Swiss-Prot record:
GO terms for molecular function: ABC-type beta-glucan transporter activity; ABC-type oligopeptide transporter activity; ATP binding; ATP hydrolysis activity. Residues 21-301 form the ABC transmembrane type-1 domain. PANTHER family: ATP-BINDING CASSETTE SUB-FAMILY B MEMBER 10, MITOCHONDRIAL, ATP-DEPENDENT PERMEASE MDL1, MITOCHONDRIAL. This is Beta-(1-->2)glucan export ATP-binding/permease protein NdvA. Belongs to the ABC transporter superfamily. Beta-(1-->2)glucan exporter (TC 3.A.1.108.1) family. The lineage of its organism: Bacteria, Pseudomonadati, Pseudomonadota, Alphaproteobacteria, Hyphomicrobiales. Keywords: ATP-binding, Cell inner membrane, Cell membrane, Membrane, Nucleotide-binding, Sugar transport, Translocase, Transmembrane, Transmembrane helix, Transport. Pfam families: ABC_membrane (PF00664), ABC_tran (PF00005). It comes from Bartonella henselae (strain ATCC 49882 / DSM 28221 / CCUG 30454 / Houston 1). GO terms for cellular component: plasma membrane. Its main location: membrane. Involved in beta-(1-->2)glucan export. Transmembrane domains (TMD) form a pore in the inner membrane and the ATP-binding domain (NBD) is responsible for energy generation. NCBIfam families: chvA (TIGR01192), PRK13657.1 (NF010178). It comes from the Bacteria.
Length: 595
């Protein structure tokens, strides 16, 4: 993408406030044209002094122009600042909404921290360009087009000096653009590496400290910063050289104008005031050319990060599901996989030609070794991924023919990783159903065996749980995740190793609750305990992405195949969790209401 196209696309993000943008730009253009009158008025003042004529009228007009210019500039700058900040936050929010709606594979390919880095840096760069566009760029371009004809009208011989100066600025800018293009792209790459390392180290701070990796991680960061500086310095050198050359050219131009002006004054072909006016024109033009040079510098330095952002934006639009898709309604829970295949990009892993049928209210246990495709199967049902071949239907309706939002309303999932937000316990559970009452939420927590431990917290349901639930134990996190799914009360329940982090006693209590809520509800369970598999209506045995065996527990045992060998090898936990009945002093629900 060329520099001009990059710049033009940045400006398209102002379209939603087109009228306000045009008003500010128009006012700034008028201001730029008015500014041109100042050197002319100054020249008249000088002539009035030299000729000893009345100076007060001209001086008064000049002062009024100056005051009006200052006031107008303040008002325009205020309007531009407010508009840019509004658009910056709006673009950030709109892009964020599209990014978090993208399929999981999209995030896995790009990296969550990388997408965040691209978004934040690009939005900041766009805000700077918008502000400069409304304050300077457009008015500078207009001023240059107006300045040159006026200058030629005043004195064509002196104007040639200004034209030569403008050509020199353009040539220097083109040279620097050509010399720094690849270097700036490399700088952006090193920026990503640096940000990725910082994000990776901080997110794994417990490992860094546990393995005494602080010095090593800091050393790696130093290496990234050194690489960044090595790439950045040549780019900075070229722009420093350009700045020096521009300054030299402008100084020589002013000297030439003064020398030529003095020559023409001595010959009586110009008045002193006209020379002074022309010097003012020259200085005004130099300031505008400097602004154009800074604009080119800014756009070039931002081009790489903006192009990454545009590529990311384009991918979100391409992956956006069609509008006006119907909703999945009145779900009963009959599910069919029809020859479903999904292969991960750049990998041989996935699931292949999977077909099975689940009747309404049945419980399905998915069994298999690590990497067999169990979680992938569940993710396809939720449309986190979409099948490469085949299709999945719920109640006879292809799930790709309905919108994702309605599909996911029909599913309640408890992941192996609890997936908690840095918010209160109440907020984390209410994600299941934001319209639920406090009483419904507390009841869901009781069913998930979470209510008792929550009441022991200082702020009870208003307790902040930290990033990724860092203030909770593994079992507590899992119980909140289960409570969230219970509260959602969806017709299809998915348990991805939902009790893996629970102790035996708590697991027994939660298992009873899950058995209760899964009654007459289609349930998928990634199973590791024999008791879960034995009680399932349908057992699916997966291996290397293939459905090797399916049937009831007794059918697969009688078959004596891979599932039977798995049992004999002890790969499924045989123990049945039990619970001892004991009296507990449970705090009443009404006492849990936050003050």
């Amino acid at each position: 993408m060329s520099l001009f196209r990059t710049y033009a696309r940045v400006l398209t993000y102002l379209n939603k406030e087109k009228n306000a943008s045009l008003l500010i730009c128009s006012a700034n253009v008028m201001l730029a044209i008015i500014t041109i009158a100042e050197p002319i008025l100054f020249g008249h003042v000088i002539d009035s002094i030299a000729e000893k004529s009345a100076i007060i009228p001209t001086l008064t007009i000049w002062v009024c122009f100056g005051i009006s210019h200052i006031l107008a500039y303040v008002l325009i700058a205020r309007g531009a600042d407010r508009l840019v900040h509004r658009r910056r936050l709006a673009v950030l929010t709109e892009s964020f909404e599209r990014i978090i709606a993208m399929p999981l594979i999209w995030h896995q390919q790009r990296g969550t921290s990388n997408a965040l880095h691209i978004l934040l840096r690009a939005v900041d760069s766009m805000a700077t360009i918008w502000l400069d566009f409304m304050r300077q760029h457009l008015s500078t371009l207009v001023a240059l087009f107006v300045l040159i004809p006026i200058a030629f009208n005043m004195n064509w011989r002196l104007s040639i000096v200004l034209v030569v100066l403008a050509i020199i600025y353009v040539l220097i800018a083109r040279l620097v653009m050509r010399k720094t293009k690849d270097g700036q792209a490399a700088v952006e790459c090193y920026h990503h590496n640096l940000f990725q390392h910082v994000s990776d180290s901080i997110s794994n701070v417990s490992i860094v400290q546990s393995y005494n990796r602080i010095k090593e991680e800091t050393s790696i960061l130093h290496q990234h910063t050194n690489d960044l500086l090595k790439a950045q310095n040549p780019v900075l050198n070229w722009w420093a050289l350009a700045s020096g050359l521009n300054r030299m050219a402008s100084t020589i131009s002013i000297v030439c104008v003064l020398l030529l002006g003095a020559f023409f004054v001595a010959k009586g072909q110009l008045r002193v005031g006209e020379v002074v006016s022309f010097v003012g024109f020259a200085q005004l033009m130099i300031s505008r050319l400097d602004q154009m040079s800074n604009f080119i510098n800014l756009t070039i330095s931002s081009q790489a990060k903006l192009q990454e952002f545009f590529a990311m934006e384009d991918s979100t639009f391409q992956s956006k599901e069609p509008e006006n898709l119907p909703s999945l309604q009145n779900v009963k829970g009959a599910i069919q996989f029809h020859h479903v295949t999904y292969k991960f990009p750049n990998s041989s892993q996935g699931i292949f030609d999977i077909s099975f049928e689940v009747k309404t209210g049945q419980t399905v246990a998915i069994v298999g070794p690590t990497g067999a495709g169990k979680t992938t199967l569940i993710n396809l049902l939720q449309r986190i991924y979409d099948p490469t071949l085949g299709h999945i239907s719920i109640d006879g309706i292809n799930i790709r023919s309905v919108n994702r939002e309605s599909l996911r309303k029909s599913l309640a999932t408890v992941f192996q990783d609890a997936g908690l937000f840095n918010r209160t316990i109440h907020d984390n559970i209410s994600i299941g159903r934001t319209t639920a009452t406090n009483e419904e939420l507390y009841e869901a927590a009781k069913i998930a065996a979470a209510h008792d431990f929550i009441l022991k917290k200082t702020d009870r349901y208003n307790t902040m749980i930290g990033e990724q639930g860092s203030q909770l134990s593994g079992g507590e996190k899992q119980r909140l995740a289960i409570a969230r799914a219970v509260l959602k009360n969806a017709p299809i329940l998915i348990l991805d190793e939902a009790t893996s982090a629970l102790d035996v006693e708590t697991e027994a209590r939660v298992k009873d609750a899950l058995d209760c809520i899964s009654h007459n509800r289609t349930t998928f369970i990634i199973a590791h305990r024999l008791s879960t598999v034995r009680n399932a209506d349908l057992v699916l045995f997966l291996e290397q992405g293939h459905l090797i065996e399916k049937g009831s527990f007794q059918e697969l045992i009688a078959k004596g195949g891979r599932f039977y060998k798995l049992l004999k090898a002890g790969s499924l936990a045989i123990n049945q969790p039990t619970i001892e009945t004991k009296d507990e002093n449970v705090i009443p629900l009404h006492e849990a209401i936050a003050s």
